[in-house]
Amino acid sequence: SSGGGDGSGMWFGPRL
């Protein structure tokens, strides 16, 4: 995932 991802497809970080 672009911006931030744990590899499971979830998002976290400055880009939601």
From Swiss-Prot:
InterPro entries: Pyrokinin_CS
Subcellular location: Secreted
GO BP terms in the entry: neuropeptide signaling pathway
Main subcellular location: secreted
Record-listed Leucine amide modification sites: L16
Record's keyword annotation contains Cell inner membrane: no
Entry GO MF terms: neuropeptide hormone activity
Record-level GO cellular component terms: extracellular region
Keyword Secreted listed: yes
Cystines in this chain: none
Keywords assigned by UniProt, alphabetized: Amidation, Neuropeptide, Secreted
Similarity comment text for this entry: Belongs to the pyrokinin family.
Function, as annotated: Myoactive.
Descriptive protein name: CAPA-Pyrokinin
Species for this entry: Lobatophasma redelinghuysense
